[in-house]
């Protein structure tokens, strides 16, 4: 791993942010991937074992459906899959995400951090991080119900849901780990940062979504297509399904190990960029000795909250409405293309 680049903070354009995130990712590839792999690989092995146990019992259930309540392999595999999913939420979404955020921030600010050092650096901040993510999940349910409220909900609900899940939620980890915010205050703080540059942040998120489609979703779809043909030669469909499940899980493992650190680096950098643009974070760092971690932590602490800041202003409602209408318009556009192709293709063939 190379030494971190000298600390030079300034407002960055979208392309510069992505370039900095990729450079940071490349310089610290082993560290960033290792932080995620330390907890994700063992859990994925358990997940593969659980899924294999459950899938291998499907042959028995297909021939004897009445044995579903006595097929302990099936229920054991299902229960263990649920347990592993719960452990992944704690260890990956909570602890590993917190450690990765700490490693990205430290290296971006000019401090070398090891894998174990990143885990030690988060302290107990993973607990409020988990709480905040659970609260985000509850809020997403509330926003989904708000979406079906006539008139105002119809035109703002989808936009609110999109912003919460794609922009505010990823910003929670830097806010909790780097600023020490609590469960509720971290979500409000993350929203406060996002709303300051609403459309540039969403544009940034959209570009990252395209990245994820290319790195994660794309290989998965290709693998599914290849496996569907290659494993069709198995006489035993259950064996083919088990092998397909294992290979798909391995592809998912590799994709996440490669992409998730890049995603967290990108969101941590836009967090810093928002603070540089709106709070003078870069100027504050120039006034202290950055070789002392205590000084950095002091500057990192969020400024006092603006007591008269409304949670949702009129301009925010307008942005939500525009986003909702844009999403609906894009959906209608693609559906029209698909339906048009379905109806026009037969006539063109004739």
Name the predicted role of every residue range:
Residues 1-11, 277-315:
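Low-complexity, intrinsically disordered extramembrane tails and loops of integral membrane proteins
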Residues 1-55, 112-115, 161-244, 248, ...:
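Nonpolar helix-loop interface/hinge motif
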Residues 2-10, 73-111, 146-188, 198, ...:
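Selective recognition of hydrophobic, aromatic-rich stretches within alpha-helical transmembrane segments
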Residues 30-38, 130-139, 143-144, 201-207, ...:
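Alpha-helical membrane-anchoring segments
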Residues 43-89, 140-163, 216-260, 312-350:
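Membrane-helix interface segments in multi-pass membrane proteins
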Residues 71, 122, 191-193:
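Short membrane-interface loop/juxtamembrane segments of multi-pass integral membrane proteins
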């Amino acid at each position: 791993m190379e030494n971190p680049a000298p600390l030079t903070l300034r407002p960055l354009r979208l392309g510069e942010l992505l370039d900095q995130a990729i450079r940071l990712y490349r310089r610290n590839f082993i560290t960033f991937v290792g932080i995620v792999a330390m907890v994700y690989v063992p859990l994925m092995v358990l997940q593969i074992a659980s899924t294999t146990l459950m899938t291998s019992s499907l042959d028995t259930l297909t021939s004897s459906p009445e044995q579903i309540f006595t097929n302990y392999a099936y229920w054991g595999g299902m229960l263990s899959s649920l347990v592993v999913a719960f452990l992944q939420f704690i260890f990956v979404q909570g602890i590993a995400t917190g450690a990765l955020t700490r490693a990205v921030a430290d290296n971006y600010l000019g401090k070398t951090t090891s894998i174990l050092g990143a885990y030690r650096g988060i302290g107990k901040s993973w607990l409020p991080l988990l709480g905040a993510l659970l609260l985000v999940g509850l809020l997403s349910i509330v926003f989904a119900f708000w979406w079906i409220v006539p008139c105002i909900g119809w035109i703002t609900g989808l936009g609110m849901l999109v912003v919460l899940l794609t922009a505010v939620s990823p910003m929670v980890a830097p806010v909790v780990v780097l600023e020490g915010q609590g469960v509720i205050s971290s979500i409000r703080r993350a929203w406060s940062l996002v709303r300051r540059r609403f459309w540039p942040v969403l544009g940034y998120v959209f570009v990252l979504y395209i990245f994820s489609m290319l790195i994660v979703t794309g290989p998965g779809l290709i693998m599914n297509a290849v496996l569907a043909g290659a494993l069709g030669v198995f006489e035993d469909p259950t064996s083919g399904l088990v092998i397909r499940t294992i290979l798909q899980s391995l592809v998912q493992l590799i994709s996440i190990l490669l992409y998730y650190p890049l995603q967290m680096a990108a969101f941590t950098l836009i967090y810093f960029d928002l603070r540089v643009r709106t709070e003078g974070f870069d100027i504050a760092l120039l006034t202290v000795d950055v070789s002392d971690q205590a000084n950095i932590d002091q500057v990192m602490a969020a400024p006092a909250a603006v007591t008269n800041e409304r949670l949702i202003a009129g301009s925010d409602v307008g942005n939500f409405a525009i986003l909702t209408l844009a999403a609906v318009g894009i959906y209608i556009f693609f559906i029209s293309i698909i339906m048009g192709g379905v109806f026009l293709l037969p006539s063109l063939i004739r």
